[in-house]
Amino acid sequence: MIKAVIFDMDGLMFDTERLAVPTWQRISRELGYEMPAEFVINMFGRNVSAISADIKKTFGEEFDTELGWKLRKQYVTEWIDKHGVPLKPGLKELLKYIRQKGLKTAIATSTDLHLVEHYLNLSGLTDYYDGIVTGQMVAQGKPAPD
């Protein structure tokens, strides 16, 4: 018997992945690099530590990943605050159905907790979730998640 439903966030609940390529390409240009779209796409679903290691391996140790993540947070937050959280079609209806069936729900994501909470607040979905687990809360993120 199914007792709970666990959702991934980026790409499943919210269409935030479409912001990743232009955001990271903007950041890399500002820092003096050119980041191919394919490189950004390979970031999807992975934790910050693993992505940062790949960035440094690919672009060099001098790539300031800490600044890159700060800029990413700033640019994505600015976009979402201006345009709203891009919900995937049918999400609210699905969540209502799951609640009607009495099932618990949770989010499992590599996104930082403060951003998850911000997106949920902006989209009005906070009350639909019973728990959140982020990549920072587990010892090993994708591709071998705990």
Regions found by a protein language model. Give the residues of each.
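Substrate-recognition "cap/lid" segment bordering the active-site pocket of phosphatases
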Residues: 85-86, 106, 112-146
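Alpha-helical substrate-recognition element adjacent to the catalytic core
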Residues: 22, 30-59, 68
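A short, Lys/Arg-enriched amphipathic alpha-helix followed by its capping loop at the start of a domain
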Residues: 26-31, 93-103
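Hydrophobic packing residues within well-ordered alpha-helices of enzyme cores
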Residues: 24, 52, 91, 116-120, ...
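Structural signature of beta-strand start/N-cap positions in the alpha/beta core
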Residues: 3-4, 96-97, 104, 130
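Short beta->alpha linker loops
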Residues: 19, 43-47, 71, 86-90, ...
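Metal-dependent phosphoesterase signature
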Residues: 34, 56-92, 101
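Active-site neighborhood of HAD-like aspartate-dependent phosphohydrolases
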Residues: 1-41
